[in-house]
């Protein structure tokens, strides 16, 4: 008995260290990838000409977001059908193509170099899905996925600080900042991708808890979506809201800080994102303690509701001069990421595990992302064309405030739908299997479904 107990403790310890290793490596890998994505946003490009009536920087952002959007639509097929072989090489190939685009952006005169932000974004848009396939379908996926997801909160601010440092201390021009920032991170990225491929596959206990995750062909994708269509449509709409406002904050953070009088402080980008990263990581990683997938799905909806509330209330206080600019940017970021991060690591993972349906998170995530970036493109173009004189800080604070009301209502609608569907399916399964109504476990699950 003592020998068996010792083996069990070793197994648990091994699982724990695999989870920690996977969390650290996925965090560092995706953080390094961000160095090829966001550094261009620190540039002001003040002397560049308008492009089709748009400010040059707005045109750059639109070009990149268009690349992400089309990448996500293409990724619905690529990521959902992805096999396990050669994933590390694929990551490096995609990043290499993206980095080459940044070199072409630097050496091609404006405005013709705008197209290279599109070619920079298209390969990068598929990397999150590839990385997530290494950690999906595990009992610790909530913890590992949280680490992966919050990496872009921290890294977005960190790589901008690195880019701003290069700009201020080495007089790097706006056009060369993206390529040289990528150069700083290229060696670490290669190392992290190698370590990423050393992550062991899910254990038998993982599979028993979260079911096996398999590639999905087109008929399987259609069948899965049709079965949950109403709840998924609501979740996708919510995700569009969150993506739009998270993306505006991410892309125009430098402009917002300049309007708020803090544009010449490189550390400000990291100062707001570090506490957000820590708080969201702790909150989301704690979901690993909830073993019941059904209960975790419900709790995730309430986290999203809380995120919308934090973002909305902090914006209302900022508009009415009850909150400092720095605290507002921190709290609105915290609220948006409380809503945004669960989509990237928990809600679809627990949805699949709750209903025991074959599939993978990549499919659902890329459907959501494709429409999210489509929404970002539309908002950025509309703002640039019709209200360009309105400061970003003003437009953003008011937009987030109204968003929060819709977000809270929509999240409760989605929760109600999944509650009802679970209750119907569980009752049908119980009747099919002739489970007696006095079965204690059955009654506990029914209470959970009605919670």
Regions found by a protein language model. Name each.
Residues 94-109, 288, 304-320:
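C-terminal ends and interior cores of transmembrane alpha-helices
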Residues 1-17, 167-236, 259, 290-292, ...:
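Intracellular loop-helix junctions on the cytosolic face of multi-pass helical membrane proteins
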Residues 58-79, 275-283:
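Central cavity-lining transmembrane alpha-helices of secondary-active solute carriers
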Residues 112-127, 322-340:
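Hydrophobic core of transmembrane alpha-helices in multi-pass small-molecule transporters
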Residues 40, 125-140, 253, 338-356:
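Intracellular juxtamembrane helix-capping segments at the cytosolic ends
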Residues 141-168, 184-185, 365-379:
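Glycine-rich segments within core transmembrane alpha-helices of 12-TM secondary carriers
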Residues 38, 230-262:
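Extracytoplasmic gate region of multi-pass secondary transporters
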Residues 265-292, 307:
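Transmembrane alpha-helices of Major Facilitator/SLC transporters
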């Amino acid at each position: 008995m003592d020998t068996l107990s010792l083996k069990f403790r070793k197994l648990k310890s091994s699982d724990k260290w695999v989870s920690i290793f996977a969390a650290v490596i996925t965090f560092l890998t995706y953080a390094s990838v961000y160095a090829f994505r966001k550094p261009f946003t620190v540039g002001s490009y003040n002397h560049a000409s308008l492009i089709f009536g748009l400010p040059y920087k707005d045109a750059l952002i639109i070009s990149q977001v268009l690349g992400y959007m089309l990448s996500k639509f293409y990724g619905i097929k690529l990521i959902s059908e992805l096999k396990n072989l050669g994933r590390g090489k694929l990551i490096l190939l995609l990043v290499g193509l993206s980095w080459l685009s940044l070199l072409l952006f630097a050496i091609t005169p404006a405005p013709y170099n705008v197209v290279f932000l599109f070619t920079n974004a298209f390969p990068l848009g598929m990397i999150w899905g590839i990385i997530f396939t290494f950690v999906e379908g595990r009992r610790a996926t909530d913890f590992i996925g949280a680490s992966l997801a919050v990496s872009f909160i921290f890294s977005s601010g960190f790589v901008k600080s690195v880019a701003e440092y290069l700009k201020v201390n080495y007089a790097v021009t706006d056009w060369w900042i993206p390529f040289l920032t990528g150069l700083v991170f290229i060696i670490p990225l290669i190392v992290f991708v190698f370590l990423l491929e050393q992550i062991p596959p899910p254990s038998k206990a993982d599979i028993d808890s979260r079911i096996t995750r398999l590639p999905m062909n087109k008929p399987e994708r259609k069948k899965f979506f049709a079965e949950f269509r109403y709840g998924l449509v609501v979740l996708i709409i919510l995700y569009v809201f969150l993506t739009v406002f998270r993306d505006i904050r991410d892309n125009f953070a430098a402009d917002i800080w300049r309007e708020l009088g803090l544009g010449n402080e490189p550390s400000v980008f990291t100062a707001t994102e570090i506490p957000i990263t820590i708080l969201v990581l702790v909150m989301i990683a704690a979901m690993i303690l909830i073993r019941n997938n059904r209960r975790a799905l419900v709790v995730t909806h309430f986290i999203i509701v809380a995120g919308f509330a934090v973002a909305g209330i902090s914006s209302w206080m900022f508009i009415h001069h009850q909150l400092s600019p720095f605290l507002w940017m921190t709290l609105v970021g915290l609220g948006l990421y409380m809503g945004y991060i669960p989509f990237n690591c928990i809600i679809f993972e627990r949805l699949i595990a709750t209903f025991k349906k074959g599939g993978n998170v990549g499919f659902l995530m890329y459907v959501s992302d494709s429409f999210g970036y489509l929404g970002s493109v539309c908002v950025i173009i509309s703002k640039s064309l019709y209200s360009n004189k309105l400061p970003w800080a003003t437009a953003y604070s008011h937009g987030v405030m109204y968003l929060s009301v819709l977000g809270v209502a929509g999240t409760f609608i989605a929760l109600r739908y999944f509650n009802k569907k679970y209750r119907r399916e569980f009752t049908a399964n119980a009747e099919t299997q002739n489970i007696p109504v006095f079965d204690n476990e059955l009654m506990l699950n029914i209470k959970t479904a009605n919670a």
